[in-house]
Amino acid sequence: MNRAIVIAGPTGVGKTKISIDLASELNAEIISSDSAQVYKGLNIGTAKITEKEMQGIKHHLIDIVEPISKYSVGNFEKDVNKILNQNPEKNFLLVGGTGLYINSVTNGLSILPEADKKTREYLSTLNNQALLELALKYDEEATKEIHPNNRVRLERVVEVFLLTGQKFSELSKKNIKNNNFKFLKIALERDRENLYNRINKRVDIMFEQGLVDEIKNLYKIYGEKLYKLNIIGYNETIDYINGKISLDEANYRIKLNSRHYAKRQFTWFKADKEYQWFNLDEVSEQEIVKTIYTLFNIKA
C-alpha cells in the first residue's frame, strides 16, 4: 500500500515551515488542504504561501478556481485522489487545517446523495410541524439530535430517505475511500495563549501587508459573491469597506473569529485518534521534522 503524510493543525500554528522542511527531506510534493487557498487572488487574507516560501517545492491545489466558482469537499476529494492515484511512486504531504477536506481523502466521502432540486422544492412547502413529523417517521435517531426549528437539517434527513429509502443516520456513517494510500497523520499544536498571540500578530501583519486594498480590488470585481464565500478576514473587511463597522472593529472581529476557528479545528483533529500530536512550544521544528521523517521511513 502506498503512503502519504498529513500535516494538520489550527490556523497560525506553524504548519508551513515544517511542511517545507519535511518535503525537502523526503523529496515530496505538497497538496494544500485549505478550503480558502484554492481561490485565485485571495492571498493576504488566507495567509497563502508565497513562491519564495515554497523554496522550489511543488504545491498542488493553490489558485485553481476563481472566487465566483463553487469548490466543495467533493471537488477536493476528486482532485486529490487524481493526484495521488496518478503518481503512486511519489511522496506527498497533505498540509492544511480544513479537517473535512483532509478527512474526505484519508477516510473517504460519505455516500449520501447530493441535494435534489425537486425534492427540496416539495419539502419547502411543508410547515415546520409537518416536516418534523416526516423526519421522525423516516429517521428518529437523526431527528432527535436536531433542533425542531432547524429546517435545513430536517429537510436533509427527509430528503436522504426519499431519495435512497435508507436512513440518514446509517448512510452518514458509511464512507467510500477512493485511493489506495495509508496516511501517517501528524497534528501540530501550541499552548493556547501562545497560539492566540500568534493569530493576533498575524492579523496585524495582514493589515500591514495591504489586506484592505486586496479585498477592495477583489470586491470591485466579484461584489457580493466574494462575501458569500464566507472566509474569515474577507467578510469583516467587506463590512468595513461598506461602512458597517470601523477598521479597528474589523481587525478585532478577524482576530476573534480566527481564534474561534482555531478552537474548532483543534477539536476536530483531536477527535481523530489516528493523529500523532506535536507541541511546537515544547519540541523544536527540527526535532519534529526528524521524528516524522523517521516514522515515515520505518513504516514505509
Where in this protein do the model-derived segments appear?
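Phosphate/pyrophosphate-binding catalytic cores of soluble transferases and nucleic-acid-acting enzymes
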Residues: 1-300
